[in-house]
Amino acid sequence: CFLKTYRAVIAGGPDEQLPPEGILRDYLFKDSRKGRVFPVKRPRKGVREAVLEYRIVETAPDGSLSLAEITLHTGRTHQIRVQFASRKHPLYGDGKYGSRFKGDIALQSARLRFVHPDTGKPMAFSLPLPAAAPWKEFLE
């Protein structure tokens, strides 16, 4: 079993479109000519289902940003970016998908767990939150 958990800083806080935790399920269409991925209403040729589970860990005091933990159930191109942006919560720094914040895209692989293929030993790796903006907003 291979488990990878991501962290992202997203615009805004929990609301009707994005409760404090949940599962996001969408159909995504990858337009290679435009270099973008779009959510669509129904399956059709070239469309793939995208599923992720998330939890809002903390929201900044002014409500402008939130820290989210994300586990992918599928691994689609730009999946995390598109699924949050389609709910009006783009990732910090992600101008391609609607962020008004300038900077690097605030998406990080936070934890990785798997069973070593030779020894069978459980392996686990994790990264701390970066000390740079916008992550430092959520450091204790």
How should each PLM-predicted stretch be described?
Residues C1-E140:
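RNA pseudouridine synthases
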